[in-house]
Amino acid sequence: MSEPLKPRIDFAEPLKEEPTSAFKAQQTFSEAESRTFAPAAIDERPEDEGVAEAAVDAALRPKRSLWRKMVMGGLALFGASVVGQGVQWTMNAWQTQDWVALGGCAAGALIIGAGVGSVVTEWRRLWRLRQRAHERDEARELLHSHSVGKGRAFCEKLAQQAGIDQSHPALQRWYAAIHETQNDREIVGLYAHLVQLVLDAQARREISRFAAESTLMIAVSSLALVDMAFIAWRNLRLINRIATLYGIELGYYSRLRLFRLVLLNIAFAGASELVREVGMDWMSQDLAARLSTRAAQGIGAGLLTARLGIKAMELCRPLPWIDNDKPRLGDFRRQLIGQLKETLQKSKSSPEK
């Protein structure tokens, strides 16, 4: 009974080898050589995308400022004044039997009620978009936790928000895979691999379809104004589709907020990756010599649409990326180039026939 307890063994993690320190051989410098030493230049690397992602996630949090409180207080006071004045007008119209004024008060009450209802609905949808960021933080904590009891309820809530029925095959596989001895990290990890991947696959198909449409539209069209309007319309529809797929109902202001956050994310972290992904393929295959200028512009527009969809997918997704399952531009680049080449070959072969 006096033997010490053995340390805990986690079979899900790889074995850790004890580091062995390697010593270099001694090197002696003369006094003349030491005078020629120069300080080593430090390579200042730019911030990685994790800093940009954190900045965008922080932008999703509600910000409480003094000016905002003053504006909200003024609007509340103005609304109370309008309601009080409307009640007084209604009482005066009823006492004087002024039916025209009474009808106007009723119409005004209906309009105000509709406006208040729309504002409440927009606020609820915007609050739901902000809550998704808190859910990602909670999921990140559960993925690093060894506690028991919270993971199953959290995953069931996510499935209900996404509109996944209890009889869905992916959800049934998840129920069959979990048991009482698993902790929250394992339960959430199983949900991410069995259920969340189904939604991610649907989002990838939507991104591929919208990116291909943008590529082909820019490649065959010669009107810049029409191209800009088409790309803007398709990008907004892509954001709506991805948000609906992940169980988020966007209103007017929440849609604008999500679109702004996606563009902010692209401006932070997208330029370097876009140049790297596109340049790697263009320099290797010399596409500039094989395709026309319009086709090259179409590929660029399609890649930007794909980048927009990836970032919208990341902001609407309830779970953080794990096991390098985040989609990359390279996943869509080859598909776009193949579809564009196939379309150009068909267009060249049709006049010959």
From Swiss-Prot:
Keywords: Cell inner membrane, Cell membrane, Membrane, Transmembrane, Transmembrane helix
Disulphide-bonded residues: none
Pfam families registered for this protein in UniProt: DUF697
Chain ranges passing through the membrane: 70-90, 100-120, 213-233
Compositionally biased region (Basic and acidic residues): 1-19
GO cellular component: plasma membrane
Main localization, broad class: membrane
InterPro entries, A to Z: DUF697, UPF0283
Location of this chain's protein in the cell: Cell inner membrane
Membrane topology type: Multi-pass membrane protein
PANTHER family membership: UPF0283 MEMBRANE PROTEIN YCJF (PTHR39342:SF1)
Family: Belongs to the UPF0283 family.
Protein name: UPF0283 membrane protein YcjF
Gene for this chain: ycjF
